[in-house]
Amino acid sequence: PIPSRGLGDVYKRQTNYFAKRFAAKEAFLKAIGTGLSKGFKFNDITIINNSKGQPFIELEKKIQLFIKKKFKIKKYQIHLSISDEKKYSIAYVILNESLK
């Protein structure tokens, strides 16, 4: 038998997890000014956490090249913040040229 105790918490955590990642991907696409156009898909963007739990964005090569061409930069940084409160998730992305 599957224990029913705690399954609601597991579902809630999974829902929050995916909602925050969706918000982060949407915020990123807005930061580069495309939305889901230019042939980009949500699967082209991956949200991961580093060893300290800080979220960051990994991009497929085609999006990396698009950013460099559109903004006429060679290197860039993506800053990501994700948060949630009860039934709401929010994310914001700052994209800036890297001087390093």
Language model: regions and residue ranges:
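Hydrophobic (often cysteine-bearing) scaffold residues that line and stabilize catalytic clefts
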Residues: 15-20, 24
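A short glycine/serine-rich beta->alpha loop
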Residues: 12-16, 79
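Glycine/charged-rich beta-loop-alpha catalytic/anionic-binding loops adjacent to active sites
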Residues: 8-9, 73-77
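Single conserved hydrophobic/aromatic residue that forms the stacking wall/gate
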Residues: 1-11
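Mid-chain, well-packed structural core segment of small domains
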Residues: 30-70
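A generic structural signal for short beta-strands and their flanking turns/coil linkers
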Residues: 25, 41-43, 76-78
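C-terminal edge-of-domain segments
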Residues: 78-100
